[in-house]
A protein has these predicted regions:
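Short alpha-helix
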Residues: 192-215
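Class I SAM-dependent methyltransferase SAM/SAH-binding core
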Residues: 43-100
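A short SAM/SAH-binding and catalytic strip from SAM-dependent methyltransferases
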Residues: 109-124
Length: 240
């Protein structure tokens, strides 16, 4: 699917990156504060579910030792393409976040995980494995959906601006279960989505020895729920 996350950076865009402070996004609507990257001097970074030829090349240009792990081979090919074009070194690994990560304990200084766990039903493995492969004092930067937006019918939110917004679903929203119950139909092109709860997202990190040291919210202004609150959350945790 062609969208904002599948368009690799151009040579000109990467030249701009070289001459400016690091600028990457975990969520829609806001860039990660550059101070987050200043909280470690380590340069070994894992971009988790982070393929597409965007963040990976930015990190490489900024002097990081970059590994990108993604389930999508086509997304990884975009990183390989940009790396070859620009003479950058990016290690690409095809992998599944729901399985053990193919890395040794305490390998990385930073894990950078843009919004993606909305497509994963059980977060337990992601946070356990992230903590395992992070070095002590390493940073986990993760973006995820604010669960409240899943209480509304997405078709009405996005495609029917004149219809009244009504609460429809309880949290945690699980589109696979709802489809099995005959309550919704999911377009296979987009896959199943899972809202999770703030407890599963935040406590999932804390109970694995990750302490939260910063946090922000951001907003996707392309839909009308954004008038009522922020629909994205990003957290910064440090491994104790």
């Amino acid at each position: 699917v062609k969208n904002d996350y599948t368009e690799p950076l151009t040579h000109e865009e990467l030249e701009e990156v070289r001459n400016n402070p690091i600028s990457v996004a975990l969520t829609v609507g806001k860039k990660v504060p550059k101070e987050w990257f200043e909280k470690t001097t380590g340069k070994k970074i894992l971009g988790l579910a982070c393929g597409g030829g965007q963040q990976g090349p930015v990190f490489a240009v900024k002097g990081y030792d970059v590994t990108i792990m993604d389930f999508s081979k086509s997304q990884l090919q975009r990183d390989d393409m940009v790396a070859k074009r620009e003479g950058l070194k990016i290690n690409t690994v095809q992998g599944d976040m729901t399985k053990p990560f193919p890395f040794e304990n305490e390998t990385f200084d930073i894990i950078f995980n843009p919004v993606s766990n909305v497509y994963v039903e059980d977060l337990e493995n992601i946070y356990k494995e992230a903590a395992r492969v992070l070095k002590k004092g390493g940073l986990l930067m993760i973006g995820f959906m604010n669960p409240w937006i899943y209480m509304y019918d997405a078709d009405i939110v996005w495609d029917k601006p004149d219809e009244e917004l009504l609460l429809k679903f309880s949290i945690p929203f699980n589109s696979r279960e709802l489809e099995e119950e005959g309550k919704i139909t999911i377009n296979p092109e987009y896959g199943y989505e899972f809202s999770h709860t703030l407890e599963t997202q935040i406590r999932g990190q804390l109970k694995n020895g990750l302490a939260m040291i910063d946090f922000y919210e951001s907003c996707d202004n392309r839909h009308r729920l954004s008038r009522y609150g922020n629909d994205y959350i990003a957290t910064l945790c440090i491994k104790l």
